[in-house]
Design a protein with these regions (language model features):
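Hydrophobic alpha-helical transmembrane segments in multi-pass integral membrane proteins
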Residues: 189-206
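Charge-rich cytosolic interhelical loops and cytosolic tails of multi-pass membrane proteins
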Residues: 79-122, 265
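Long, highly hydrophobic alpha-helical transmembrane signal-anchor segments
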Residues: 18-73, 120-139
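Hydrophobic alpha-helical membrane-embedded segments
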Residues: 33-46, 58-93, 141-144, 151, ...
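Juxtamembrane/interface segments at transmembrane-helix termini
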Residues: 82-95, 167-174, 220-238
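Cytosolic-side membrane-entry/anchor segment at the start of a transmembrane helix
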Residues: 2-45, 94-110, 177-183
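Short, highly charged, low-complexity non-transmembrane loops/tails of multi-pass membrane proteins
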Residues: 226-271
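Membrane-helix boundary/juxtamembrane motif in polytopic membrane proteins
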Residues: 167-192
């Protein structure tokens, strides 16, 4: 198998740019979410009753550590509804105040084609996600798994969401094919995906999170349908690489470049 040539290695190294505030913030969020998942795993094996207490009827009777977790999770969605200035442009691009129209006139037909292609890909992702989670839903409804397992699954998705943003996203690589998260058509679908397992648990904790996530999703889709020009780099120069201030692709892009070269070398070797 061929080795990656030195010029290619230099190209991979040169992808890295100075860390931005957004990148550092999201790395901290990844660590924080990882700690929450570890705590949930610990509770699952050591004190499962405490984990299940999130979805019990006494959740609203007293204020304790469970409500702090709930507030943190809810806050994570509220900042996407507003949206807050410190989150990535991947979410904020839906707002009018982040839209920058190009000086040269863009092709409306090309924008329309972009919308059509991205919509088809987006609903493929939705279909795959619903089918995948339908497996857990059936297991839950037949009593094979319970509330604790569904909560743990949701916390796993909670971490996976940030991994998709910073490190690797299978939906981006295999289906959407967008060049980065800032340009992602389904960026604000994340919370809906995170809390999908909670739909099947009848409690204030689970349903408040799931249906708030639905509001985030619906808001995103309404804006996308009304103002698609905000979501395409050809009609919104804010989304172009040279204007990016987030730089949250610092890990993902070098990995993509490395994977591309390895794949090419494997193909050349098999010829």
């Amino acid at each position: 198998m061929k080795k990656i040539k030195r010029p290619d290695l230099e190209k991979i190294k040169n992808i890295k740019r100075p860390n931005s505030f957004t990148f550092i913030l999201y790395m901290c969020r990844l660590v924080f979410r990882g700690l929450i998942l570890l705590a949930a795993v610990y509770l699952y094996f050591a004190h499962r009753d405490l984990l299940v207490s999130f979805v019990r009827d006494d959740f609203l009777r007293t204020f304790d550590w469970r409500h702090v977790i709930w507030l943190v999770l809810m806050f994570g969605m509220i900042i996407h509804i507003l949206p807050a200035k410190f989150i990535t442009m991947g979410s904020r691009k839906s707002s009018l105040n982040t839209y920058t129209e190009p000086t040269a006139h863009y092709d409306s037909d090309e924008l329309y084609r972009f919308v059509q292609i991205m919509n088809v890909k987006a609903w493929k992702v939705m279909l795959i996600w619903l089918c995948f989670n339908a497996v857990f839903a059936v297991l839950y409804l037949f009593g094979v798994i319970g509330n604790a397992e569904m909560l743990l699954l949701s916390f796993l998705y909670f971490v996976s969401d940030m991994i998709c943003i910073l490190i690797f996203c299978p939906f981006q690589s295999l289906i959407m094919k967008n060049r980065c998260c800032v340009n992602c058509r389904i960026f604000d679908w994340g919370h809906f995906m995170i809390y999908t397992p909670l739909l099947f648990i009848k409690s204030f904790f689970s349903w408040s999170l799931f249906f708030t996530a639905c509001i985030v999703l619906i808001r995103w889709e309404v804006i996308y349908a009304s103002h698609p020009e905000r979501f395409w780099h050809g009609s919104n120069t804010t989304l172009q690489c040279e204007n990016c201030k987030d730089r949250i692709c610092q890990i993902k892009q070098p990995l993509k470049e490395m994977y591309r070269h390895i794949s090419k070398n494997i193909q050349d070797y098999l010829k």
